[in-house]
Amino acid sequence: MSENLFSKKKIFFNQTIGKKEVKNVIAWAFTSYGAARTAYLVEQLKDLGFHYATKAGISLSVEDLLIPPLKDSLLQTAENEIKATLNRYLLGEITEVERFQKVIDIWHRTSETLKDEVVDYFKSTDPLNSLYMMSFSGARGNLSQVHQLVGMRGLMADPQGEIIDFPIRSNFKEGLTTTEYLISSYGARKGVVDTALRTADSGYLTRRLVDIAQEVIIREIDCETPRGVILTALKENGKILISLKDRLVGRVLLHNLYHPKTHSLIAQKNESISVLLADDIIKAGLKEVWIRSPLTCKATRSVCQYCYGWNLAHGRLVELGEAVGIIAAQSIGEPGTQLTMRTFHTGGVFTAEVAKQITAPFPGRIYYPLNTTFREIRTRYGDNAWWVENNAKLRLEGENGKRVSFNLTQGSIIRIKDQSWVETNDLLAEIASTAPNTRRAKEKTTRELRTDIAGEVYFQNLEIDEAGGQVDTAGGSIWILGGNVYNLSSNFDVILKNGDFILNGSILARTQFISQYGGYVRLTDDNLTVEVIPASLKIQNAKIFIDETDQPCLHFKNNETFELKIQNETQLKHGQVVAERYLTTEMGGIIRYADLDAKTTNKNGYEITKSGSLLWIPEETHEVNTEAKNVLVKNGQYIPSGTQLIKNKKIRNKHSGVVELVHKKNFVIEIIIKPGIVLKIKNNVSFSKKAKRFIQPGEYLFSKFVVEDLRYLDYIITSTGIILLLRPVVEYKVESPKTIIRDDKNHLKISSIQSILYKDGERIKSVQGIELFKIQLKLQVRKGLKHLPIKTNFIPSSQNSFELEFLIIESILPKNDKYFDSTVLESLAKAQTKILVKNNQLVKKGELIAQIEIISINQGEIRWIGDNTAKQIRRLLLITEKQIVTIPIQNLTKLKNKNLNLGNFIRAGEEIEETIKIPNSGQIIEITSTYIRLRISRPYLISARAIIRVLTGDLVQSGESLALLVFERAKTGDIIQGLPRIEELLEARKPKDNCVLSTHPGFTQLYYSETIELKIKSLDKINTLLELQPGVFPTVTNNQFIEAGAPLSEGDISVHEILEIFFNLYFKNRVNCLSLADAIHLSLQKIQQFLVSEVQSVYQSQGIDISDKHIEIIIKQMTNKVKIEEGGDTTLLPNELIEFQQIEKMNEKFSTSNGQLASYTPILLGITKSSLNTQSFISAASFQETTRVLAKAAVEGKIDQLRGLKENVIIGNLIPAGTGFSAYNDNAVFQNEDIESIEVKTSVLNSPAESDTNSDLDDIILNKD
């Protein structure tokens, strides 16, 4: 630093300067010397850093990555522990969950030990190592990354967030194996996905926070509130998260502060607390300080300067008009993104806290303390341990008079029995946290227990609730008695019985295949499928040809040709269309039915049910939609074909006839050309009334003309009169459905079905020809054979033609895997298929066609045959020599174990003689004087509340689920939990598994029976008896004094329940005879303090510092409403939400006029609900539910006072903050206050406490005005 700048006093920091220390130096300089000189100092530090960084030339190379030599031995120790845990699991001593948790804990502890070893190795061998200096100075990287580089990567999480119990033993220097690389990619991907998802959540959280707090602006200097809050150091689990000094800096004192011993004045009321003053307060030994807070500020919908304190950016009292609500929202919301970004730095590596453990410093004997109660429990690793119910001391006495004591807090767990001998470094106990009411957040989860071997299920000491399928609280074991289990379809007949002994090659089961209909046999080329053909039909009078467009056609001998709709070797069903053809006209026209009956079908138009005639009156219709002046033809004009109809358009008629124009206003929308003969009759008007009808052949017309064929009499109105027109009619004969071909037995037939595509009297507008009706050939099958598939067969007839054949197929022998599980049978048995018929053989109905036999490839004894109706399978158990073990013994009478009876279970490792141990767990099936025979079995320990998937006696395959183990685990405190927890608190959500809370202060009494009962005895003789649910354990001890609202059991705390408890305590129970307003103030204050602490602990767990005042502003907005119970003489309605300050003023006004007061209760709203219930309906409508909010505001006739920033921005006003604050100054801030009181308040700003006592020069930037 420059000498002239510090000529009066030189300051020297004699320590290693890392990232944290540089931060502290800059903060100290800023507080003591102002921004200008701090900027100069930072410049100097930057130059100094670059100068020496250039000289040193520190870089990272592979040689800098030093792997501790102890790594191999640590990994070997962990492997040995895991092997021992696996042996306990195989013996049925611990459950699958306990094994899993133990393995996870072993690897995590190993990883942490190795991490410490990495640090120690760097310190002792190479303290100037580049990697070590970079990470520990805070320049680049962190300990977790260093650990992954030179230690071990550790445990990873799978895509569901579950920890994989296979850790990555390698580090990045050694390189990962293929398996480790795949597992590693899980965590890395999970990190990226979580970051993407949580970033959106964080942004939405910020939006909600801004919405609730945007109206909070510094509008007053001093609200003169007598209320405040007590600040203490924030602790969790006995660890200080935020010191009292850090919490005090920037706040304003509520009262004068005196030294507790000398009683001298330390600081005055309304004095802001600087760093130096905070030091003085801590030195004085004060543990708690009353300060002003936004939570207790009396300013209406705002905060005053004194209750807010410093603007943390400048280190001095906040100015009027500062939008502190927006700052608070951003301060809480912005680090939400950081809460998720942490995954990138660790790559999804799992981390967790290890419980504080006590190990033996020397060999000796353990002695439990006297007069202390212990409760035997089972740890989460399956070990027996003792839970300490009161604070106590554990004593270890060694040889030569060595003695040491260990302090145990209530809730600690002792791992060694009383008066047991221990060796050095043996684990003695795990210490519970000393923090009051400490509870680890837990969550219920499940894990599938799957069997490792196939065999028979046997329950041992297992009691199951039949209704829910759950194990009772005692637990028990499931044994799987080994054997080969065969899965057979229910179609198979087992030809053996229980107790049969079979040899290799014996038939276990068979299934026979019989023809249900009879017919000709057709074998496939691979002889794997047998098909019986009960019926077939060949169309003799038609052949298939391919036309010019490569479309197959069916051509009949009567020259009718149909378009084929099927292909060769395709499967058909009853009623399917085989071929079809259409009758097409030359132009559009009018259709009329004559003696026809038709029914409507979905797609095929109108199907003919009765034969008759179809009359067709042709006409050519051009849809032009043009102005009348553009039309070149006239109404009633006869025109030849090819005449141009529209000016400048190539629209010409294809047929000659008389023109009829259809007008709509000044437009011609249609030009109709009607072929026919024009009749010139003088009295056309009278004859036109007889028109629009059919004229039969031979009929006289006008007593002059004889009509030779069927005609239609029409007329056209022209400008000169009426023209009569004799139009041609085409008659089509239409037939009802008929069979055109059938087989000999009438099983199959082809029917011809005709359908008309238009309804009677319909006019079809067209220039081109249209498809008038169609003829379809449909395949019909007899009722008894409809469910069988029908296959097509094109039989070559000549070079370019085929004959068409239809075959009804009965498939007799489908693929084998339909009837048994080939994967299971592969190693146990083989399937043999026998076909008992020949190709083209005629078989009768009920004749045997083929059979499948299951042949054993092992020899052994059939012990069980059973059905599994749920899975539609039959299972068969075969015990072979592989499942039997013979143990030789010397003398039956000298056996140590007296429990050796037939049918008993024995576990591996048990001694039956001095030199003989049982090699495998199993069931005793034979005892002789020279040997014992065991059936190899596997025991599985089942915990309480597990859901059982099998029944005793069931047969199971290896890998099948036996039970669903239900257990509780501590919630991981990683990044994934951070943001949801903040959201849960700020949205004031009710927890799923909430703990039991004390309703009043008192002493506890515990009663243990089938359930745990807890009684609270208060000093005023109010007793409350609470019963805990099964599986829920108390967190308090006998005769422990507890406060109201304290948690008594495990689980999450419900904020709403705390609020209700304290309100009942302060007001409804009338303990202190408080007024309604005071009771609400006090009960809300408890909630506010709880929420501030909880939010801070989440952010502090991730190393993020947020000032209390920001959180307090948000929580003030959440707790500033009350719910009306009775409106009294006010206009308020029950359940209406209103601001607490507003109802207080209303009640105060009514009390002076002796009116009936409104009654109300406190309520806690989440940030979303608070935003929607704000006074400004413009702000609320712009947030969510716009229509509902605006409609409600309109109905209630609300007026928006435009006090916040958001509503002013929306309507285009100047915002009431910063420079725009003065525009609102007159009415909003100094209302009902005189000038004299303003001067008194502002004079405090110039008190000595606010002046800079450490600086000799005025700061050139901050104090230039």
UniProtKB/Swiss-Prot annotation:
Gene Ontology terms: cellular component: cyanelle; DNA-directed RNA polymerase complex; mitochondrion
Co-factor note (free text): Binds 1 Zn(2+) ion per subunit.
Keyword 4Fe-4S (UniProt): no
Keyword Nucleotidyltransferase in annotation: yes
Residues reported in the UniProt entry to bind Zn(2+): 223, 297, 304, 307
Reactions performed catalytically: RNA(n) + a ribonucleoside 5'-triphosphate = RNA(n+1) + diphosphate
Pfam families reported for this sequence: RNA_pol_Rpb1_3, RNA_pol_Rpb1_4, RNA_pol_Rpb1_5
InterPro entries the UniProt entry points to: DNA-dir_RpoC2_beta_pp, DNA-dir_RpoC_beta_prime, RNA_pol_Rpb1_3, RNA_pol_Rpb1_3_sf, RNA_pol_Rpb1_4, RNA_pol_Rpb1_5, Rpb1_funnel_sf
The protein's required cofactors: Zn(2+)
Family per record: Belongs to the RNA polymerase beta' chain family. RpoC2 subfamily.
Role according to the record: DNA-dependent RNA polymerase catalyzes the transcription of DNA into RNA using the four ribonucleoside triphosphates as substrates.
Name of the featured protein: DNA-directed RNA polymerase subunit beta''
Organism (species): Cyanophora paradoxa
